[in-house]
């Protein structure tokens, strides 16, 4: 098999109408890197793989995010990030989560309550395994949109069924 790509090397995905950019993003920041406060134009979930990241937002004021932790930032949130150590994380950007199971969604909406304080969630073993398998593929120049769609659905499935 030529190369280490998940897709066939002879397919050019750049012109594909289903090319999905920046839905899943892998970030690798060196210690001290600062991302100034910026307004989220979409909802996002940040999945920490390695290191410590200081997040400052209305929902998470001064929270240090560590390996295996997740936070959700809503559309309109203003978020500032500082890498306290070398960090690796994956961000999932979305307007609406894909609806995988309508019954489960309705059950969650009936039971959901706004938290008094926002704290990071801890990734389950399955979710951590999924997230840590993504960086190599996401680092490719043009990751396959069908693969990204599948991984997004898998993320949502694991989150809605285990949290």
Model-found features: residue ranges?
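N-proximal short alpha-helices
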Residues: 11-21, 44-45, 121, 128
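Sequence-level detector for tyrosine residue identity
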Residues: 6, 10, 26, 89-92, ...
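N-terminal regulatory/effector-sensing and dimerization cores
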Residues: 18-111
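Generic low-complexity, intrinsically disordered sequence content enriched
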Residues: 1-2, 33, 49-50, 142, ...
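A short, N-terminal "cap"/entry segment at the start of jelly-roll beta-barrel domains
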Residues: 1-19, 137-143
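Amphipathic alpha-helical segments enriched in hydrophobic/aromatic residues interleaved with Lys/Arg
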Residues: 104-159
């Amino acid at each position: 098999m030529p190369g280490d790509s998940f897709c066939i090397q002879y397919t050019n995905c750049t012109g594909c109408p289903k090319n999905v950019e920046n839905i899943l993003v892998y970030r690798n920041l060196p210690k001290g890197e600062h991302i100034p406060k910026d307004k989220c134009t979409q909802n996002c979930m940040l999945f920490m793989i390695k290191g410590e990241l200081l997040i400052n937002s209305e929902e998470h004021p001064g929270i240090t995010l560590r390996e295996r932790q997740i936070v959700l930032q809503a559309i309109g949130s203003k978020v500032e990030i500082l890498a306290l150590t070398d960090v690796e994380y994956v961000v999932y950007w979305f307007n609406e989560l894909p609806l995988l199971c309508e019954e489960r969604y309705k059950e969650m909406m009936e039971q959901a309550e706004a938290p008094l304080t926002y704290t990071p969630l801890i990734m389950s073993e399955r979710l951590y395994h999924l997230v840590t398998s993504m960086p190599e593929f996401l680092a490719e120049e043009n990751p396959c949109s069908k693969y990204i769609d599948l991984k997004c659905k898998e993320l949502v499935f694991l989150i809605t069924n285990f949290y």
